[in-house]
């Protein structure tokens, strides 16, 4: 929703902060280059309209090989089968995680954090504090956006029924598949230090995932698990009327 409003009001917001701005010229390349150079040399912001640039495929040396990993969609379909028509609340982080949940989890109770990266765990924690059974579906890049949410949830570990699933595909798929450069981050140890009950190993098989999800379905705890996953084909965005839902 923030994208819908920010896109139309961005020039006003820039002016309110006291900056100048250009709308990047998408008809005259020479003028566009002049605008970009001017923005680089002065306190001027360049606003780029949608579809100004064509889609660019990453160079081969920057592409990650995830061919040996199970696509995230298969894990999500497993969740849909296990939690179909239950009152468990699923919070989906922004980007492809939410899009794939919309496509592969049609029978679960989903809340999508569209355009709001890093807040999924905090929203899920709030719902869990209110008495809901919550499962947050996050990603590796999203994990580091608001790590304070981990320690906040960990403080009330005995009072909430909340599971945080981190789907690690090592990239930002929705913005082009760029490497997150987070191979040095030990997600499991960070969650454990924040007082989560953790699955000690990274999940790579569908059978192990199903087994753990069955345990989560039947128990109440503050749980964390990291799932190594691959990529699915592009899936559609959830419709705006679904994204606009503001109640669980």
Segments predicted by a language model, with ranges:
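Short beta->alpha linker loops
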Residues: 25-28, 96, 203-208
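YjeF_N-associated NAD(P)HX repair module
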Residues: 48, 54-63, 239-248
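Active-site diphosphate/adenylate-binding microenvironment
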Residues: 58-117
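Glycine-rich beta-alpha junction loops
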Residues: 48-53, 94-98, 169-171, 228-233
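Short glycine/proline- and acidic residue-enriched helix-loop micro-motifs
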Residues: 19, 62-64, 195-196
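N-terminal alpha/beta PP-like core and its mobile active-site loop of ThDP/TPP-dependent enzymes
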Residues: 1-24, 30-39, 45-48, 165
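Thiamine diphosphate
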Residues: 1-7, 15, 32, 73-78, ...
